[in-house]
Curated annotation (Swiss-Prot):
One of its GO terms (molecular function) is DNA binding. It is linked to Cowden syndrome 4: A form of Cowden syndrome, a hamartomatous polyposis syndrome with age-related penetrance. Cowden syndrome is characterized by hamartomatous lesions affecting derivatives of ectodermal, mesodermal and endodermal layers, macrocephaly, facial trichilemmomas (benign tumors of the hair follicle infundibulum), acral keratoses, papillomatous papules, and elevated risk for development of several types of malignancy, particularly breast carcinoma in women and thyroid carcinoma in both men and women. Colon cancer and renal cell carcinoma have also been reported. It is found in: Nucleus. The gene is KLLN. This is Killin. Its main location: nucleus. Residues 8-50 bind DNA.
């Protein structure tokens, strides 16, 4: 009795289904596809080969998975949270408390108690257009953050803090007050 060598496939099976001749090969109990569909086919003088259609390791969530950058995006507090204004994010609360200890002024204290004076209710144009804009903010999208959000290096030196005025005003109707 002739047995195939190690690693070779068993002879193909032919089945007639509704007038069509269906042929497939089986290796180790798994169905294989001919190279006409799965590979290069007859291009370049290749032999007729069979390709294993099993998925390789690590392809389970390759297409449908989305990586949520929760840790990355939580570094930058948004002007309006998704909870409807009931409570701000934990990062914003912690940063406001730290800011009030270093530079106690009424805007920071009011923002921590719940009054929404430090962060505006309206958004600038294009503030949340996608993940790319969070990492590369357009100069036209100014979030109007309060003075307590300035870098600590400016407040440690005791220098006069410059007034933040955007180059292109987000709100053309409002005029700067002198």
């Amino acid at each position: 009795m002739d047995r195939p060598g190690p690693g070779s496939a068993r002879p193909g099976r032919t089945v007639h289904v509704w007038g069509y001749r269906v042929e497939w090969k089986v290796r180790n109990g798994r169905k294989l596809q001919p190279s006409e569909w799965a590979g290069r086919g007859d291009l370049g003088g290749f032999k007729r080969r069979w390709k294993d259609t099993r998925a390789t390791v690590g392809t389970t969530f390759r297409r449908r998975s989305r990586v949520s950058l929760v840790g990355e995006l939580s570094k930058f507090p948004l002007p309006s949270d998704s909870s409807g204004g009931k409570s701000s994010s934990s990062f914003a609360r912690g940063a406001l408390a730290w800011c009030r200890q270093r530079n106690p002024n009424p805007s920071c204290a009011a923002a921590e108690t719940g009054a929404r004076t430090s962060l505006p209710k309206e958004r600038c144009r294009g503030w949340r257009l996608g993940n790319w804009l969070h990492k590369h903010p357009h100069p036209n999208t100014c979030p109007r953050l309060p003075a307590c959000w300035l870098p600590p290096i400016l407040t440690e030196r005791g220098e006069r803090v410059p007034k933040l005025v955007p180059l292109l005003a987000c709100y053309p109707k409002s005029k700067p007050k002198d």
